[in-house]
Amino acid sequence: MGKVYRHKPGAPDEYLGRVEPESGKVYRHCRGPDEYLGRGELDSGKIYRHRHGPDEYLGQVYLDNGEVYSHRFGPDRYVAKVKPNGRIYGHKPRAPDDYLGKVEGMHSLAEGGAAFFLLLLPVVERAEIEAGEG
């Protein structure tokens, strides 16, 4: 099981959830049963968010180099990099990439891509919005 942690400078990293290595399913840590968020296809690197009805395609991690691309409007955008050691870096144009967190016990780069889209990205985006309001 890949445990997903968000990096917090100067503090212990925050446990967000887990990625199942056999299925690529992602669960957010909650009180009581963990919440199923979506999945990463281990053979293709495609990431899907769980929805009622068809799942939503979010993007893909390339399994040969760990580059993560977001599928939004227009062409896919390079948004992150997953390293073989489980570390995940958010892409910043014309600046060093930000270290966002890690997947401990990662078996596939697809697990890291799923952790980025389904666990790390929502938390990072929410923190950026809150910082802008404060």
Outline where the language-model segments fall.
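Long terminal segments
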Residues: M1-G24, C30, S44, R51-G134
